[in-house]
Amino acid sequence: MKLMTMPSEFQKALPILTKIKEAGYEAYFVGGSVRDVLLERPIHDVDIATSSYPEETKAIFNRTVDVGIEHGTVLVLENGGEYEITTFRTEDVYVDYRRPSQVSFVRSLEEDLKRRDFTVNALALDENGQVIDKFRGLIDLKQKRLRAVGKAEERFEEDALRIMRGFRFAASLDFDIEAATFEAMRSHSPLLEKISVERSFTEFDKLLMAPHWRKGISAMIACQAYDYLPGLKQQEAGLNHLIVSLKDNFTFSDHHQAWAYVMISLAIEDPKSFLKAWKTSNDFQRYVTKLIALYRIRQERSFEKLDIYQYGKEMASLVEDLRKAQSLSVDMDRINTLDQALVIHDKHDIVLNGSHLIKDFGMKPGPQLGLMLEKVELAIVEGRLDNDFTTIEAFVREELAP
């Protein structure tokens, strides 16, 4: 198969391939970018594979950076762009089901492609637009099928994260997993416990943000892979609820909303501990737990002005988005009205601060000072007090009166 036109991302990188070939080596576009252009999807990263060894690659170009030279990768700075160029390689026995004990550089494109995870990711493209397909990836692409390269059992024993990648690609590409590949994923799912939580989180997160995320979750359920992921053991019912409780065309607005609703569906009692088990950042934990708290408030009643002040319009909108997807009552107009009615959106908007209370009222730093500032803040938010220096001073004076 030959491309009639090369996408602009590849055209810009063609001089890189030309230089490498003029130096006497082979060079191809490889991986996800080739797959995506054939599927007419947006291209993100342009990856180049070459028969030149790292030191040979560096000798060809003036500006290079060693970003992963032990694995054969050199970053080339050329034509205003950055390109990762990786030497064809084979990988020795894998350690802990996640990383090769040794990487060997080779001159053969086929040897390089045969170590990849799925056939649709094992395609290469030359400078003339000719697709190189050694493992029937084009047929799988046409039939929307995800199939492991070579023996599926070996691919998942080498790196068990490929199981999570399989779920993610099913979700992002809307592909069905080929039977033998699926069975190998199912039988090797216990190996997911050997994978770093951070790597599993990245794949699960991408799955949740994919347009066909239900397909990825359904495959995970069928494989019983969830039993080997943090906080998901014996959570088949909760994951099924996640799939069926939202409208068919619903996709999550952002990562916070997705993970919040996962925990809502699973009825997680301690969201922070759940997210800690996934080794997420403190900021991520803080935002998602607040989002769940606001969702639960909304289950009980309509939003009030204080809710919008404390949680923000954006977070309230994410909650309403989830409610709409469940065919529950939604009131975005109320959120906008309450937000517009707020005199302040943050305590730093208050014209008087702790320093004024210490200087003008002789208050001492400590709990009493903090409590007074909270009273001022609440009174302003609720509309009982103007955000005016003189008015606030009078309010404080009255509060301090014996």
UniProtKB/Swiss-Prot annotation:
GO biological process, one term: RNA repair
Cofactors required: Mg(2+)
Binding positions for Mg(2+) per the UniProt entry: 45, 47
PANTHER family in the record: CCA TRNA NUCLEOTIDYLTRANSFERASE 1, MITOCHONDRIAL
Note from the entry: A single active site specifically recognizes both ATP and CTP and is responsible for their addition.
Family: Belongs to the tRNA nucleotidyltransferase/poly(A) polymerase family. Bacterial CCA-adding enzyme type 3 subfamily.
Protein known as: CCA-adding enzyme
Species assigned in the record: Streptococcus pyogenes serotype M5 (strain Manfredo)
The organism's taxonomic lineage, starting at the top: Bacteria, Bacillati, Bacillota, Bacilli, Lactobacillales
Gene field: cca
